[in-house]
Amino acid sequence: MALWGGRFQGETSALFKLFNDSLPVDYRLFEQDVIGSIAWADAIASVGIISATECRDLKKALNDLLVEVNGDPAIILASGAEDIHSFVESALIAKVGDLGKKLHTGRSRNDQVATDLKLWCQSEGAALLARLQSLHAELLALAEREFDAVMPGYTHLQRAQPVTFGHWCLAYVEMYERDISRLADALTRANTCPLGSGALAGTAYKMDRHALAAALNFAAPTLNSLDSVSDRDHVVELCSTASISMMHLSRMAEDLIFFNSGEANFISLSDEVTSGSSLMPQKKNPDALELIRGKTGRVYGSLVGILTTMKALPLAYNKDMQEDKEGLFDVVDSWAICLDMAALVLSGLKVNRPNALLAAQQGYANSTELADYLVSKGMPFREAHHVVGEVVVAAIAKQIPLEEFSLAELKTFAAIIEDDVYPNLTIEACLAKRDVLGGTALPQIQQAIAAKKAR
Protein backbone atom coordinates (compact mmCIF):
# COMPACT_ATOMS: atom_id res chain seq x y z
CA MET A 1 0.00 0.00 0.00
CA ALA A 2 1.42 3.39 -1.03
CA LEU A 3 1.11 6.13 1.56
CA TRP A 4 0.49 8.85 -1.03
CA GLY A 5 -1.98 7.45 -3.62
CA GLY A 6 -4.89 9.89 -3.33
CA ARG A 7 -3.29 12.59 -5.46
CA PHE A 8 -2.70 10.25 -8.41
CA GLN A 9 -5.10 8.86 -11.02
CA GLY A 10 -2.69 6.84 -13.15
CA GLU A 11 -0.74 3.74 -12.19
CA THR A 12 2.90 3.85 -11.18
CA SER A 13 5.13 2.11 -13.72
CA ALA A 14 6.86 -1.07 -12.65
CA LEU A 15 10.20 0.46 -13.56
CA PHE A 16 9.55 3.54 -11.43
CA LYS A 17 8.52 1.35 -8.49
CA LEU A 18 11.76 -0.61 -8.81
CA PHE A 19 13.71 2.65 -9.04
CA ASN A 20 11.86 4.43 -6.24
CA ASP A 21 11.36 1.73 -3.62
CA SER A 22 13.91 1.75 -0.81
CA LEU A 23 12.79 -1.28 1.20
CA PRO A 24 15.72 -3.46 0.00
CA VAL A 25 17.99 -0.98 1.80
CA ASP A 26 16.00 0.65 4.61
CA TYR A 27 14.56 -2.62 5.95
CA ARG A 28 17.45 -2.37 8.39
CA LEU A 29 15.61 0.48 10.11
CA PHE A 30 12.68 -1.77 11.07
CA GLU A 31 13.35 -1.86 14.80
CA GLN A 32 13.94 1.89 14.95
CA ASP A 33 10.76 2.55 12.96
CA VAL A 34 8.70 0.52 15.40
CA ILE A 35 10.31 2.13 18.45
CA GLY A 36 9.70 5.58 16.99
CA SER A 37 6.09 4.67 16.21
CA ILE A 38 5.50 3.52 19.79
CA ALA A 39 6.78 6.86 21.07
CA TRP A 40 4.64 8.68 18.51
CA ALA A 41 1.53 6.81 19.69
CA ASP A 42 2.14 8.17 23.19
CA ALA A 43 2.73 11.66 21.76
CA ILE A 44 -0.54 11.82 19.80
CA ALA A 45 -2.40 10.33 22.77
CA SER A 46 -1.03 13.15 24.92
CA VAL A 47 -2.78 15.73 22.70
CA GLY A 48 -6.04 13.82 22.38
CA ILE A 49 -5.77 12.46 18.85
CA ILE A 50 -6.23 8.92 20.12
CA SER A 51 -7.59 7.63 23.40
CA ALA A 52 -5.58 5.87 26.04
CA THR A 53 -7.19 2.57 24.99
CA GLU A 54 -6.34 3.16 21.35
CA CYS A 55 -2.80 4.06 22.31
CA ARG A 56 -2.47 0.85 24.29
CA ASP A 57 -3.83 -1.22 21.38
CA LEU A 58 -1.46 0.44 18.90
CA LYS A 59 1.55 -0.11 21.12
CA LYS A 60 0.63 -3.75 21.70
CA ALA A 61 0.26 -4.34 17.97
CA LEU A 62 3.60 -2.66 17.28
CA ASN A 63 5.35 -4.74 19.93
CA ASP A 64 3.73 -7.89 18.54
CA LEU A 65 4.99 -6.93 15.07
CA LEU A 66 8.48 -6.45 16.46
CA VAL A 67 8.45 -9.98 17.90
CA GLU A 68 7.05 -11.48 14.69
CA VAL A 69 9.60 -9.87 12.40
CA ASN A 70 12.51 -10.66 14.71
CA GLY A 71 11.38 -14.28 14.46
CA ASP A 72 11.10 -14.18 10.67
CA PRO A 73 12.93 -11.18 9.16
CA ALA A 74 12.12 -12.33 5.62
CA ILE A 75 8.57 -11.04 6.16
CA ILE A 76 9.74 -7.50 5.45
CA LEU A 77 11.23 -7.97 1.99
CA ALA A 78 8.49 -10.41 1.00
CA SER A 79 5.90 -7.67 1.56
CA GLY A 80 6.85 -5.67 -1.53
CA ALA A 81 6.27 -2.42 0.39
CA GLU A 82 7.73 0.85 -0.87
CA ASP A 83 9.83 1.43 2.23
CA ILE A 84 10.11 0.39 5.85
CA HIS A 85 7.53 2.97 6.97
CA SER A 86 4.97 1.61 4.49
CA PHE A 87 5.65 -1.93 5.67
CA VAL A 88 5.14 -1.08 9.34
CA GLU A 89 1.97 0.91 8.70
CA SER A 90 0.46 -1.77 6.44
CA ALA A 91 1.27 -4.51 8.95
CA LEU A 92 -0.22 -2.39 11.74
CA ILE A 93 -3.46 -1.80 9.82
CA ALA A 94 -3.68 -5.54 9.17
CA LYS A 95 -3.58 -6.07 12.94
CA VAL A 96 -5.84 -3.29 14.26
CA GLY A 97 -7.79 -2.08 11.24
CA ASP A 98 -8.65 1.59 10.85
CA LEU A 99 -7.01 2.41 14.17
CA GLY A 100 -3.67 1.81 12.47
CA LYS A 101 -4.48 4.59 10.01
CA LYS A 102 -4.51 7.11 12.87
CA LEU A 103 -0.90 6.58 13.88
CA HIS A 104 0.61 8.78 11.18
CA THR A 105 -1.44 11.80 12.23
CA GLY A 106 0.84 14.84 12.51
CA ARG A 107 3.87 12.89 11.36
CA SER A 108 5.71 12.83 8.02
CA ARG A 109 8.01 10.23 6.61
CA ASN A 110 10.52 13.08 6.56
CA ASP A 111 10.79 13.42 10.34
CA GLN A 112 10.10 9.71 10.72
CA VAL A 113 13.09 8.56 8.66
CA ALA A 114 15.32 11.26 10.16
CA THR A 115 14.46 9.88 13.60
CA ASP A 116 14.88 6.26 12.54
CA LEU A 117 18.29 6.98 11.07
CA LYS A 118 19.52 8.86 14.14
CA LEU A 119 18.33 6.02 16.38
CA TRP A 120 20.17 3.55 14.15
CA CYS A 121 23.35 5.65 14.20
CA GLN A 122 23.22 5.84 18.00
CA SER A 123 22.80 2.07 18.33
CA GLU A 124 25.43 1.13 15.76
CA GLY A 125 27.75 3.87 16.99
CA ALA A 126 27.67 2.42 20.50
CA ALA A 127 28.56 -1.01 19.10
CA LEU A 128 31.41 0.51 17.08
CA LEU A 129 32.73 2.27 20.17
CA ALA A 130 32.84 -1.09 21.93
CA ARG A 131 34.73 -2.58 18.99
CA LEU A 132 37.23 0.28 18.98
CA GLN A 133 37.77 -0.16 22.70
CA SER A 134 38.33 -3.91 22.23
CA LEU A 135 40.92 -3.24 19.53
CA HIS A 136 42.55 -0.63 21.76
CA ALA A 137 42.76 -3.16 24.60
CA GLU A 138 44.20 -5.86 22.32
CA LEU A 139 46.86 -3.48 21.01
CA LEU A 140 47.74 -2.35 24.52
CA ALA A 141 48.11 -5.98 25.62
CA LEU A 142 50.43 -6.60 22.67
CA ALA A 143 52.45 -3.50 23.57
CA GLU A 144 52.85 -4.86 27.09
CA ARG A 145 53.93 -8.32 25.87
CA GLU A 146 56.48 -6.96 23.41
CA PHE A 147 57.41 -3.66 25.07
CA ASP A 148 61.16 -4.36 24.88
CA ALA A 149 61.38 -6.14 21.51
CA VAL A 150 63.87 -4.04 19.53
CA MET A 151 63.20 -3.28 15.88
CA PRO A 152 64.18 -0.59 13.39
CA GLY A 153 62.04 2.50 13.12
CA TYR A 154 61.56 3.85 9.63
CA THR A 155 61.25 7.10 7.74
CA HIS A 156 60.75 6.99 3.96
CA LEU A 157 60.66 3.20 4.48
CA GLN A 158 64.40 3.40 5.22
CA ARG A 159 65.82 2.24 8.52
CA ALA A 160 66.17 5.33 10.66
CA GLN A 161 66.54 4.78 14.43
CA PRO A 162 65.93 1.80 16.69
CA VAL A 163 62.61 1.64 18.50
CA THR A 164 60.74 -1.15 20.23
CA PHE A 165 57.69 -3.04 19.07
CA GLY A 166 55.92 -1.75 22.16
CA HIS A 167 56.60 1.80 21.02
CA TRP A 168 55.18 0.96 17.59
CA CYS A 169 52.04 -0.47 19.22
CA LEU A 170 51.59 2.65 21.34
CA ALA A 171 51.65 4.83 18.21
CA TYR A 172 48.52 3.08 16.98
CA VAL A 173 47.01 3.12 20.47
CA GLU A 174 47.16 6.92 20.20
CA MET A 175 45.43 6.83 16.82
CA TYR A 176 42.61 4.58 18.02
CA GLU A 177 42.11 6.76 21.09
CA ARG A 178 41.51 9.68 18.74
CA ASP A 179 39.06 7.52 16.80
CA ILE A 180 37.20 6.70 20.01
CA SER A 181 37.06 10.39 20.92
CA ARG A 182 35.87 11.39 17.44
CA LEU A 183 33.12 8.77 17.39
CA ALA A 184 31.93 9.70 20.88
CA ASP A 185 31.80 13.37 19.85
CA ALA A 186 29.87 12.55 16.68
CA LEU A 187 27.31 10.55 18.65
CA THR A 188 26.91 13.42 21.11
CA ARG A 189 26.11 15.81 18.26
CA ALA A 190 23.66 13.31 16.78
CA ASN A 191 21.82 12.91 20.09
CA THR A 192 18.86 15.14 19.19
CA CYS A 193 15.36 14.04 18.18
CA PRO A 194 13.77 15.28 14.91
CA LEU A 195 10.39 13.64 15.57
CA GLY A 196 7.63 16.23 15.66
CA SER A 197 9.19 18.31 12.89
CA GLY A 198 6.62 17.08 10.36
CA ALA A 199 7.36 17.36 6.66
CA LEU A 200 9.31 20.59 7.12
CA ALA A 201 7.32 23.15 9.16
CA GLY A 202 6.67 21.28 12.40
CA THR A 203 3.71 19.18 13.49
CA ALA A 204 0.33 20.89 13.81
CA TYR A 205 -0.31 19.30 17.21
CA LYS A 206 1.09 21.04 20.27
CA MET A 207 2.83 18.11 21.88
CA ASP A 208 5.77 18.12 24.28
CA ARG A 209 8.75 17.41 22.04
CA HIS A 210 11.09 17.33 25.03
CA ALA A 211 9.08 14.41 26.44
CA LEU A 212 9.07 12.77 23.00
CA ALA A 213 12.85 13.07 22.76
CA ALA A 214 13.28 11.64 26.27
CA ALA A 215 11.01 8.71 25.43
CA LEU A 216 13.40 7.79 22.62
CA ASN A 217 16.49 8.31 24.81
CA PHE A 218 17.65 11.39 22.95
CA ALA A 219 19.29 14.15 24.97
CA ALA A 220 17.03 16.84 23.51
CA PRO A 221 14.70 17.65 20.62
CA THR A 222 15.99 19.41 17.51
CA LEU A 223 15.26 23.14 17.42
CA ASN A 224 14.43 23.93 13.78
CA SER A 225 12.05 21.83 11.72
CA LEU A 226 13.62 22.72 8.36
CA ASP A 227 17.03 21.62 9.57
CA SER A 228 15.61 18.60 11.38
CA VAL A 229 14.26 16.86 8.28
CA SER A 230 17.13 17.83 5.97
CA ASP A 231 20.07 17.24 8.32
CA ARG A 232 22.33 14.33 7.48
CA ASP A 233 25.42 15.62 9.26
CA HIS A 234 25.31 12.56 11.50
CA VAL A 235 25.64 10.33 8.43
CA VAL A 236 28.53 12.43 7.10
CA GLU A 237 30.26 12.47 10.49
CA LEU A 238 29.91 8.73 10.98
CA CYS A 239 31.31 8.09 7.49
CA SER A 240 34.08 10.63 8.10
CA THR A 241 35.01 9.15 11.47
CA ALA A 242 35.00 5.69 9.91
CA SER A 243 37.22 6.91 7.06
CA ILE A 244 39.81 8.33 9.45
CA SER A 245 39.74 5.17 11.54
CA MET A 246 40.02 3.00 8.42
CA MET A 247 43.05 5.08 7.42
CA HIS A 248 44.62 4.13 10.75
CA LEU A 249 43.66 0.49 10.29
CA SER A 250 45.07 0.53 6.76
CA ARG A 251 48.36 2.08 7.87
CA MET A 252 48.68 -0.51 10.63
CA ALA A 253 47.87 -3.26 8.14
CA GLU A 254 50.52 -1.95 5.74
CA ASP A 255 53.14 -1.89 8.50
CA LEU A 256 52.29 -5.43 9.55
CA ILE A 257 52.25 -6.70 5.96
CA PHE A 258 55.78 -5.35 5.57
CA PHE A 259 56.92 -6.67 8.96
CA ASN A 260 55.53 -10.09 7.97
CA SER A 261 57.23 -10.15 4.57
CA GLY A 262 60.20 -12.37 3.85
CA GLU A 263 62.29 -9.24 3.40
CA ALA A 264 61.67 -8.14 6.99
CA ASN A 265 60.42 -11.22 8.86
CA PHE A 266 59.91 -9.26 12.08
CA ILE A 267 56.59 -10.91 12.94
CA SER A 268 54.60 -14.09 12.37
CA LEU A 269 50.84 -14.11 11.84
CA SER A 270 48.50 -16.78 13.10
CA ASP A 271 47.07 -19.36 10.71
CA GLU A 272 43.65 -18.00 11.73
CA VAL A 273 44.11 -14.84 9.68
CA THR A 274 46.19 -16.02 6.73
CA SER A 275 45.54 -18.07 3.62
CA GLY A 276 47.52 -20.02 1.05
CA SER A 277 48.05 -20.02 -2.69
CA SER A 278 46.20 -22.25 -5.13
CA LEU A 279 49.47 -22.78 -7.01
CA MET A 280 52.40 -22.13 -4.66
CA PRO A 281 52.28 -24.47 -1.67
CA GLN A 282 54.84 -22.52 0.36
CA LYS A 283 52.76 -19.33 0.55
CA LYS A 284 51.16 -17.96 3.72
CA ASN A 285 49.46 -14.76 2.70
CA PRO A 286 48.39 -11.94 5.06
CA ASP A 287 44.92 -11.76 3.50
CA ALA A 288 43.16 -10.36 6.57
CA LEU A 289 45.48 -7.36 6.59
CA GLU A 290 45.27 -6.90 2.83
CA LEU A 291 41.47 -6.91 2.96
CA ILE A 292 41.51 -4.29 5.72
CA ARG A 293 43.71 -2.16 3.48
CA GLY A 294 41.46 -2.83 0.49
CA LYS A 295 38.17 -2.08 2.23
CA THR A 296 39.44 1.35 3.19
CA GLY A 297 38.80 2.55 -0.36
CA ARG A 298 35.13 1.60 -0.33
CA VAL A 299 34.64 3.43 2.98
CA TYR A 300 36.23 6.54 1.49
CA GLY A 301 33.94 6.16 -1.52
CA SER A 302 30.84 6.21 0.66
CA LEU A 303 32.03 9.36 2.42
CA VAL A 304 32.54 11.12 -0.91
CA GLY A 305 29.16 9.79 -2.02
CA ILE A 306 27.15 11.29 0.85
CA LEU A 307 29.05 14.58 0.69
CA THR A 308 28.34 14.83 -3.03
CA THR A 309 24.67 13.90 -2.55
CA MET A 310 24.16 16.59 0.07
CA LYS A 311 26.29 19.39 -1.38
CA ALA A 312 23.61 21.18 -3.45
CA LEU A 313 20.30 20.18 -1.88
CA PRO A 314 17.89 23.03 -1.17
CA LEU A 315 15.91 22.98 2.06
CA ALA A 316 14.20 20.89 3.13
CA TYR A 317 13.76 17.20 2.25
CA ASN A 318 14.61 15.92 -1.23
CA LYS A 319 14.40 12.38 -2.57
CA ASP A 320 18.15 12.49 -3.18
CA MET A 321 18.46 11.89 0.55
CA GLN A 322 17.13 8.36 0.10
CA GLU A 323 20.69 7.65 -1.09
CA ASP A 324 22.05 8.35 2.41
CA LYS A 325 21.59 4.84 3.77
CA GLU A 326 23.20 2.33 1.43
CA GLY A 327 26.64 3.87 1.72
CA LEU A 328 26.25 4.41 5.47
CA PHE A 329 25.23 0.81 6.07
CA ASP A 330 28.19 -0.43 4.03
CA VAL A 331 30.55 1.89 5.92
CA VAL A 332 29.38 0.61 9.28
CA ASP A 333 29.51 -3.04 8.18
CA SER A 334 33.00 -2.65 6.68
CA TRP A 335 34.39 -0.71 9.62
CA ALA A 336 32.94 -3.16 12.14
CA ILE A 337 34.40 -6.28 10.55
CA CYS A 338 37.77 -4.58 10.00
CA LEU A 339 37.94 -3.62 13.68
CA ASP A 340 37.11 -7.19 14.69
CA MET A 341 39.61 -8.65 12.23
CA ALA A 342 42.39 -6.29 13.31
CA ALA A 343 41.88 -7.35 16.92
CA LEU A 344 42.04 -11.01 15.90
CA VAL A 345 45.26 -10.42 13.94
CA LEU A 346 46.89 -8.75 16.93
CA SER A 347 45.81 -11.46 19.36
CA GLY A 348 47.81 -14.12 17.51
CA LEU A 349 50.79 -12.01 16.41
CA LYS A 350 54.29 -13.08 17.45
CA VAL A 351 57.41 -10.94 17.20
CA ASN A 352 60.51 -12.61 15.77
CA ARG A 353 62.85 -10.83 18.16
CA PRO A 354 66.22 -11.99 16.76
CA ASN A 355 65.33 -10.89 13.23
CA ALA A 356 63.92 -7.56 14.36
CA LEU A 357 66.97 -6.88 16.54
CA LEU A 358 69.37 -7.78 13.73
CA ALA A 359 67.60 -5.37 11.39
CA ALA A 360 67.82 -2.63 14.01
CA GLN A 361 71.57 -3.22 14.31
CA GLN A 362 71.98 -2.80 10.57
CA GLY A 363 71.39 0.22 8.39
CA TYR A 364 73.50 2.57 10.55
CA ALA A 365 70.58 3.36 12.82
CA ASN A 366 73.09 4.53 15.46
CA SER A 367 74.35 7.38 13.26
CA THR A 368 72.38 9.96 15.19
CA GLU A 369 74.03 8.75 18.40
CA LEU A 370 77.46 9.37 16.91
CA ALA A 371 76.37 12.87 15.90
CA ASP A 372 75.02 13.51 19.41
CA TYR A 373 78.32 12.25 20.84
CA LEU A 374 80.24 14.79 18.75
CA VAL A 375 77.86 17.52 19.92
CA SER A 376 78.57 16.50 23.52
CA LYS A 377 82.26 17.08 22.76
CA GLY A 378 81.56 20.63 21.62
CA MET A 379 81.07 20.23 17.87
CA PRO A 380 78.09 22.15 16.38
CA PHE A 381 75.34 19.75 15.32
CA ARG A 382 75.35 20.73 11.66
CA GLU A 383 79.09 20.01 11.46
CA ALA A 384 78.63 16.78 13.39
CA HIS A 385 75.88 15.76 10.96
CA HIS A 386 78.28 16.23 8.05
CA VAL A 387 81.11 14.34 9.74
CA VAL A 388 78.90 11.36 10.56
CA GLY A 389 77.67 11.31 6.96
CA GLU A 390 81.29 10.84 5.88
CA VAL A 391 81.76 8.08 8.47
CA VAL A 392 78.68 6.27 7.12
CA VAL A 393 79.98 6.49 3.54
CA ALA A 394 83.26 4.92 4.67
CA ALA A 395 81.45 2.23 6.66
CA ILE A 396 79.33 1.31 3.65
CA ALA A 397 82.45 1.04 1.52
CA LYS A 398 84.04 -1.29 4.09
CA GLN A 399 80.72 -3.08 4.73
CA ILE A 400 81.03 -2.74 8.50
CA PRO A 401 78.85 -1.14 11.19
CA LEU A 402 80.02 2.12 12.76
CA GLU A 403 81.03 0.47 16.01
CA GLU A 404 83.56 -1.77 14.22
CA PHE A 405 85.75 1.15 13.21
CA SER A 406 88.89 1.34 15.33
CA LEU A 407 89.42 4.45 17.41
CA ALA A 408 92.26 5.45 15.12
CA GLU A 409 89.99 5.21 12.10
CA LEU A 410 87.28 7.28 13.78
CA LYS A 411 89.80 9.94 14.73
CA THR A 412 90.57 10.50 11.06
CA PHE A 413 87.07 11.95 10.79
CA ALA A 414 87.10 13.88 14.08
CA ALA A 415 90.05 14.11 16.45
CA ILE A 416 87.77 14.71 19.43
CA ILE A 417 86.48 11.12 19.32
CA GLU A 418 87.75 8.99 22.22
CA ASP A 419 87.18 5.48 23.58
CA ASP A 420 84.03 6.65 25.33
CA VAL A 421 82.27 6.78 21.96
CA TYR A 422 81.64 3.03 21.79
CA PRO A 423 79.10 2.72 24.63
CA ASN A 424 77.06 5.39 22.84
CA LEU A 425 76.77 3.29 19.69
CA THR A 426 75.02 0.27 21.18
CA ILE A 427 71.34 -0.41 20.54
CA GLU A 428 70.73 -0.21 24.28
CA ALA A 429 72.24 3.28 24.40
CA CYS A 430 70.21 4.40 21.40
CA LEU A 431 67.00 3.41 23.18
CA ALA A 432 67.99 4.61 26.64
CA LYS A 433 68.79 8.14 25.44
CA ARG A 434 65.18 8.60 24.29
CA ASP A 435 64.03 8.79 27.91
CA VAL A 436 61.60 11.66 27.41
CA LEU A 437 57.81 11.79 27.43
CA GLY A 438 56.69 10.04 24.26
CA GLY A 439 60.12 8.53 23.65
CA THR A 440 61.11 4.94 22.96
CA ALA A 441 63.20 4.36 26.12
CA LEU A 442 61.90 1.32 27.96
CA PRO A 443 60.89 3.21 31.14
CA GLN A 444 58.85 5.62 29.02
CA ILE A 445 57.08 2.77 27.26
CA GLN A 446 56.30 1.04 30.55
CA GLN A 447 54.97 4.28 32.03
CA ALA A 448 52.83 4.93 28.96
CA ILE A 449 51.33 1.44 29.09
CA ALA A 450 50.63 1.74 32.81
CA ALA A 451 49.00 5.15 32.37
CA LYS A 452 46.72 3.90 29.60
CA LYS A 453 45.76 0.77 31.52
CA ALA A 454 44.85 2.91 34.54
CA ARG A 455 42.27 4.95 32.59
Curated annotation (Swiss-Prot):
GO cellular component: cytosol
Pathway annotation from the record: Amino-acid biosynthesis; L-arginine biosynthesis; L-arginine from L-ornithine and carbamoyl phosphate: step 3/3
Major subcellular site: cytoplasm
PROSITE patterns: FUMARATE_LYASES (PS00163)
A Gene Ontology biological process term: arginine biosynthetic process via ornithine
EC number(s) per entry: 4.3.2.1
Keyword Hydrolase attributed: no
Top-level lineage group: Bacteria
UniProt KW keywords: Amino-acid biosynthesis, Arginine biosynthesis, Cytoplasm, Lyase
Family, per entry: Belongs to the lyase 1 family. Argininosuccinate lyase subfamily.
Entry protein name: Argininosuccinate lyase
Species annotation: Shewanella baltica (strain OS223)
Taxonomy of the source species: Bacteria, Pseudomonadati, Pseudomonadota, Gammaproteobacteria, Alteromonadales
